[in-house]
C-alpha cells in the first residue's frame, strides 16, 4: 500500500473527543495525526458555551487527574465559575464554568499545534483502509485521494457523520454550525458492517446582548470563592472580573405560540427521524411532555467577552424561523431582542456502542477506536472523557502494553463507558450522578486521589503534575495524623468555648478527627480547639479532609461494596466463549451474552435482561474451566 505518510495513531475529528485522544496518544510517545474538516473549528462549542455541571464537572476533574487537557483549558478561558449543589452532600457537588467559546477553542488549538509528536491537518477522511483479511485498520483515505498509514485509528466525528440540520421544513446536509457533513465515512462504516443508529440533538437561538432588557431577568453571578477544574491551577489566578448569566422564564404566551404551531414542528411532523436526548429536550417537546407546567427556566448565557451573542439555555428548538422570532419576543427581557442565529436540530449517525470493548476499540476491526458523540453520547465532557480513554488505549496497543480500563468504582468515565458497552443506548447518553452506584467515592474533591497514580502509570501525567500531587497527598497525610492525635479535653474553658459556638459539652476527651465527625462541625472550628497546623494547609486538602472524616462510615460501606464487585470483575470470561454450552441459562440471557460478549463476570451481571440465576450458572461454569 502506497501511503503519503505513516503514523502510529490517526484521529479523525478535532472536537472535544478528538483533541483529548490526539494529545493523549502524542504525549505517550505515539506519532499522531489529527485530521479535522475545518481547522477553525478545533474544540469548537456548537451548543452551550459552558464546561462542567452535575456529574460532568466531576468528569472534567477526572480528565485532569489522568493528565488530560480540558480542565486546564477551561481554567484559562472561563468568564464565570460556579460550584453547584453546595447545599447538598459532597457526592453531587460539581463545578460549572461559563466559557469564552472562541478563546476556549483558540487556546486548545494552540495546545494541539504546539504538542510534540502531534500533527494537525485539515482534510476529510472518507474511507478506512483495512488489511487483506478486512480485520485490521491500516490507514485512511481522504476526499482528495491522499492515503495515510496508521497502526491505530480513532474516529471522533461528533455529529458530522451524515449530519443534517433541520429548521422547520428546511433540511439540508451539514455538520454542526454549518460545517461539512461527513457522508463518505458514514457510508464506509456501514459497508464495513457496523450497526449504525440515528440520533438527534439541537441548539437554541442566539440573541444580541445589547437588545436584552436585563431589568426583567434575575442575575446569576459566579462564585467569589476560588475553584478550579485543574488540580494544577492556583487560587491566585482565580478570575475576579466575572460575567454573570441571567435567569428568565417562558410564559403562557410562549406556550401558546408553540402549541399553535406544533403541526409545523419537525419533531412532530415526521421530518425528524433521529432519537433525541431525554435529558435535554427541545422546548416544543417540553411543553408537550410537561403540559401542566406554567413556565420553564431559561438561562441567558454570554458566549464570551468579545462577542454580542447570548445563548438562550433551555430554549433548544427546530421550529420554523418565523415561529422562533415570535417565541423569543414572548420571553420577559427579550421582547425587543434581536435574534442573531436561529435554533436548529441536527441528525447524525452513531456507531451503536455495544459493538465496542471497554477500551473503546471496536470488536469488528482491530486497531479501530471510536469516541464521543460517534458512540451515542451527548455533551463535551462525556466526549472528552471517552477521547482520553481511546487515545490512551491506542497508544498502549501500539506499545504492546496492558490495556487501560477504568472501573465503575474508579471514575464517572468508567461508569459511562461500562454503561455504553454493556447496556448500549437507544438515545443520546448523558452522565448523571444517579448512574453511579458508588457516587460517594466518585467525588469532585478526590478525583486526583483516585486517578493521578493511574495516569502516571500509563505515562500521561507529567513530572510537574506528579510532584504537585505527591506534595498535596503528603500534606493530607500529615494533617490527618495530627487531627487523629491532637485532643479536645473536657476542661472548663473548652466547655465554655463549645457553648459559645452552640455545641453541647463533651464528657470525654475527643481527637480533632472525632470532633470533626459531627455533621455540624467544620475544620476551622476544630482548629479553634487544637490549634493551627505548623504549615499552611491548602484549601483543597481541607475540603478532602472534611469529607473523608465526616462521611467515613458511609465511605467504608461503599468500599465494602466495591470489594465485592471487584471479585466478580476479577473472573475473566474467555474471548472465544461458546454461549450455547450454557444449557440452563435463559434464552434472553444467551442472546444478550452473544450480542455484548462480556469480558468479565461483573460486566455480564450488569447486562439488562440477565438475572442472578443466569450469573450463578455462568459462575459455576467458569469455575469448572
Curated annotation (Swiss-Prot):
HAMAP family from the UniProt entry: MnmG_GidA
Essential cofactor(s): FAD
Gene Ontology CC entries for this record: cytosol
GO molecular function: flavin adenine dinucleotide binding
Compartments, record wording: Cytoplasm
Main location: cytoplasm
GO BP annotation list: tRNA methylation; tRNA wobble uridine modification
Assembly: Homodimer. Heterotetramer of two MnmE and two MnmG subunits.
InterPro entries to which the protein is assigned, alphabetical: FAD/NAD-bd_sf, GIDA_C_N, MnmG, MnmG-rel, MnmG-rel_CS, MnmG_C, MnmG_C_subdom, MnmG_C_subdom_sf
Described function: NAD-binding protein involved in the addition of a carboxymethylaminomethyl (cmnm) group at the wobble position (U34) of certain tRNAs, forming tRNA-cmnm(5)s(2)U34.
Lineage summary: Bacteria, Bacillati, Bacillota, Bacilli, Lactobacillales
Matches recorded under Pfam families: GIDA, GIDA_C_1st, SAM_GIDA_C
Residues given in the record as NAD(+) binding sites: 276-290
Species per Swiss-Prot/TrEMBL record: Lactococcus lactis subsp. cremoris (strain SK11)
Binding residue positions for FAD: 13-18, 125, 182, 373
Name under which the protein is recorded: tRNA uridine 5-carboxymethylaminomethyl modification enzyme MnmG
The family this protein is said to belong to: Belongs to the MnmG family.
Alphabetically ordered keywords of this record: Cytoplasm, FAD, Flavoprotein, NAD, tRNA processing
Amino acid at each position: 500500500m502506497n501511503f503519503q505518510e505513516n503514523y502510529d495513531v490517526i484521529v479523525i475529528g478535532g472536537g472535544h473527543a478528538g483533541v483529548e485522544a490526539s494529545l493523549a496518544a502524542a504525549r505517550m510517545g505515539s506519532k499522531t495525526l489529527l485530521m479535522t474538516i475545518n481547522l477553525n473549528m478545533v474544540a469548537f462549542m456548537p451548543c452551550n458555551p459552558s464546561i462542567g455541571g452535575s456529574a460532568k464537572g466531576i468528569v472534567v476533574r477526572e480528565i485532569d487527574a489522568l493528565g488530560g487537557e480540558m480542565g486546564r483549558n477551561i481554567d484559562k478561558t472561563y468568564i464565570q465559575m460556579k460550584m453547584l449543589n453546595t447545599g447538598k452532600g459532597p457526592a453531587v457537588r460539581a463545578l460549572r464554568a461559563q466559557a469564552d467559546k472562541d478563546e476556549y477553542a483558540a487556546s486548545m488549538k494552540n495546545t494541539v499545534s504546539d504538542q510534540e509528536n502531534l500533527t494537525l491537518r485539515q482534510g476529510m477522511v472518507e474511507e478506512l483502509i483495512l488489511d487483506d483479511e478486512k480485520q485490521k485498520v491500516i490507514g485512511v483515505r481522504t476526499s482528495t485521494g491522499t492515503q495515510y498509514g496508521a497502526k491505530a485509528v480513532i474516529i471522533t466525528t461528533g455529529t458530522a457523520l451524515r449530519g443534517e440540520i433541520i429548521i422547520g421544513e428546511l433540511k439540508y446536509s451539514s455538520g454542526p454550525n454549518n460545517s461539512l457533513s461527513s457522508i463518505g465515512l458514514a457510508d464506509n462504516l456501514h459497508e464495513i458492517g457496523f450497526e449504525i443508529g440515528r440520533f438527534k440533538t439541537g441548539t437554541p437561538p442566539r440573541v444580541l446582548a445589547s437588545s436584552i432588557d436585563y431589568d426583567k431577568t434575575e442575575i446569576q453571578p459566579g462564585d467569589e470563592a476560588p475553584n478550579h477544574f485543574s488540580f494544577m491551577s492556583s487560587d491566585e489566578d482565580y478570575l475576579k472580573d466575572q460575567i454573570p448569566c441571567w435567569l428568565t422564564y417562558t410564559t403562557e404566551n410562549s406556550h401558546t405560540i408553540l402549541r399553535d404551531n406544533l403541526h409545523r414542528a419537525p419533531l412532530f411532523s415526521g421530518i425528524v427521524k433521529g432519537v433525541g436526548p431525554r435529558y435535554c429536550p427541545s422546548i416544543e417537546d417540553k411543553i408537550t411532555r410537561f403540559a401542566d407546567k406554567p413556565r420553564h427556566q431559561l438561562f441567558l448565557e454570554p458566549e464570551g467577552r468579545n462577542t454580542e451573542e447570548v445563548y438562550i439555555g433551555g430554549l433548544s428548538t427546530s421550529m420554523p424561523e418565523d415561529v422562533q422570532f415570535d417565541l423569543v419576543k414572548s420571553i420577559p427581557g427579550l421582547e425587543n431582542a434581536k435574534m442573531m442565529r436561529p435554533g436548529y436540530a441536527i441528525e447524525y449517525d452513531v456507531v451503536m456502542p455495544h459493538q465496542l470493548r471497554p477500551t473503546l476499540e471496536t470488536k469488528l476491526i482491530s486497531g479501530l477506536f471510536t469516541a464521543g458523540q460517534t458512540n451515542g453520547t451527548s455533551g463535551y465532557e462525556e466526549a472528552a472523557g471517552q477521547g482520553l480513554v481511546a487515545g490512551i488505549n491506542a497508544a498502549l496497543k501500539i506499545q504492546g502494553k496492558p490495556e487501560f480500563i477504568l472501573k465503575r468504582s474508579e471514575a464517572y468515565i468508567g461508569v459511562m463507558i461500562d454503561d455504553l458497552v454493556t447496556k448500549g443506548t437507544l438515545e443520546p447518553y448523558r452522565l448523571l450522578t444517579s448512574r453511579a452506584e458508588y457516587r460517594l467515592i466518585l467525588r469532585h474533591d478526590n478525583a486526583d486521589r483516585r486517578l493521578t497514580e493511574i495516569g502516571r502509570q500509563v505515562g500521561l501525567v507529567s513530572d510537574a503534575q506528579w510532584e504537585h500531587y505527591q506534595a498535596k497527598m503528603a500534606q493530607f497525610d500529615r494533617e490527618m495524623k495530627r487531627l487523629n492525635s491532637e485532643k479536645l479535653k473536657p476542661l472548663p474553658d473548652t466547655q465554655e468555648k463549645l457553648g459559645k459556638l452552640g455545641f453541647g459539652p463533651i464528657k470525654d476527651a475527643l481527637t480533632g478527627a472525632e470532633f470533626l465527625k459531627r455533621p455540624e462541625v467544620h475544620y476551622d472550628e476544630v482548629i479553634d480547639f487544637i490549634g493551627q497546623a505548623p504549615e499552611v494547609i491548602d484549601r483543597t486538602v481541607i475540603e478532602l479532609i472534611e469529607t473523608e472524616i465526616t462521611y467515613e462510615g458511609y465511605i467504608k460501606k461503599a468500599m465494602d461494596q466495591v470489594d465485592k464487585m471487584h471479585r466478580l470483575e476479577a473472573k475473566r470470561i474467555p474471548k472465544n466463549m461458546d454461549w450455547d454450552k450454557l444449557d440452563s441459562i435463559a434464552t434472553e440471557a444467551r442472546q444478550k451474552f452473544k450480542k455484548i460478549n462480556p469480558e468479565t463476570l461483573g460486566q455480564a451481571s450488569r447486562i439488562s435482561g440477565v438475572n442472578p440465576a443466569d450469573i450463578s450458572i455462568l459462575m459455576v461454569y467458569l469455575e469448572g474451566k
